[in-house]
């Protein structure tokens, strides 16, 4: 740091600005780059960038009166450094850009071409894409044709695509997003950070749903094993953020309670799982993770939630200013904040060592917006292994690792609602990918045979005839796009999970799945779902939170569907497979384990 400044004792903004100017020599060489970069990155924490630009303009004008040519050129070197190091500020802040243009115009009027040439504000690239909630960047096609069936993806391939998706989303986060989160304590008016958080949550939920989508314990154990190896590959890629999401999904209560499932997981996998869980545990303020991160070389993706907690803790523990008049900023706090934010900023300077398949990304981007509540996940877990089921007698006595502490205040953020135009764009790209990979004969239409192949990725698609609107025996791109748009809007983002109720008589009392009270009488006082058999009172239909769990089978989208519960916020989603539960008995609290089905079991999707 500059010798004349003692940041630990505090200093004014003007003193720190002067110290940054004096850090340059007349040739533009900076003697204290850490001080300069820290102040230019951190100044919005204390004053708006427009005020800083005004101070620089004032210093330059004052140096002209004092005939201090050295101060003039040093000021211009600082402005050049600012534009070079943080160009997004100038593209996204028109007021700031205009002030710098004003300084450049002043230099031109004076005929000072040498100083003016140092300030290149006209060629700042656009960064408006950083403010868009979703953005698809072109990526190189892989030479070999990658399978679009999620079950066919090797752990490394899946880890690479997860890394690519999260990295692309992370690169849009700017300093102002971190500052807003720390000052507000939440993601209010912060859609970019909120979207990244929802992606983290989506990965965690997707892991749970992929496990719970399998009807038998050995199959679920196989999915757990697969995701443990995905987590291992994420560690090799030094992607700790997605590693935390995957481990969190594996250790969630809806999965950890599946005792029979865990009895089929090998001891070797359990040992690996325990090691990965221990790495991201909160013990010792995430000491294991911090040590591993510090030892990383090259690309690394830190756990954003951990570092956001650090920022919030600093904000609460230390004041921004050391005096009531707010003239002397807290330099010690600034240095600590900078060390955290600089670590996060380094992520965007190094690209991950992965390549992504555009078609697979399009499918994943659509499936990402599936949303399930904690209660819905737990209900599905109870369907798989009801509470009353006795523990299995098995030679394998493996138990799942304890669930790592969850960053509740961070991961519980609601999913931001995408606008219609963005949703249409994703659906169209997804449909293009489907036709490019599954239209075998290349005639621009999907035949019934090709449709059955597609169901490997979209098991909750309705019957072929529901998509074939003109009934010509094949499905066009327009018909498939129309189907997804219609389904998403009509079902409130819950495709494949909506009950198909009809009035039902019962010769004996049955319990309402919502209120648990008996449905009495034989005069059609109750409703029953044709697909899954769930019963409820007519007045309870709209409040029923249990979703229809029948497997992909013909069910018209025009059938009756309950209105979404006012207590739940539904977000758009697209249909993906969950296996069908077995027929319920007369005793409602429990659901018998379904029989193994010979039809396709569905593929990963639900929630990447």
From Swiss-Prot:
Forms a signaling complex with RAP1 and BRAF. Interacts with RAP1. Interacts with F-actin. Residues 154-387 form the Ras-GEF domain. A zinc finger (Phorbol-ester/DAG-type) spans 498-548. It comes from Bos taurus. This is RAS guanyl-releasing protein 2. It is linked to Defects in RASGRP2 may be the cause of Simmental thrombopathia. An inherited platelet disorder first described in Simmental cattle and characterized by mild to severe bleeding episodes. The modification Phosphoserine is found at residues 116-117, 147, 554, 575. CDD domains: C1_RASGRP2, EFh, RasGEF, REM. Functions as a calcium- and DAG-regulated nucleotide exchange factor specifically activating Rap through the exchange of bound GDP for GTP. May also activate other GTPases such as RRAS, RRAS2, NRAS, KRAS but not HRAS. Functions in aggregation of platelets and adhesion of T-lymphocytes and neutrophils probably through inside-out integrin activation. May function in the muscarinic acetylcholine receptor M1/CHRM1 signaling pathway. Residues 382-407, 556-591 are annotated as: Disordered. Belongs to the RASGRP family. Pfam families: C1_1, EF-hand_5, RasGEF, RasGEF_N. Ca(2+) 1 binds at residues 439, 441, 443, 445, 450. The N-terminal Ras-GEF domain mediates association with F-actin. It is a peripheral membrane protein.
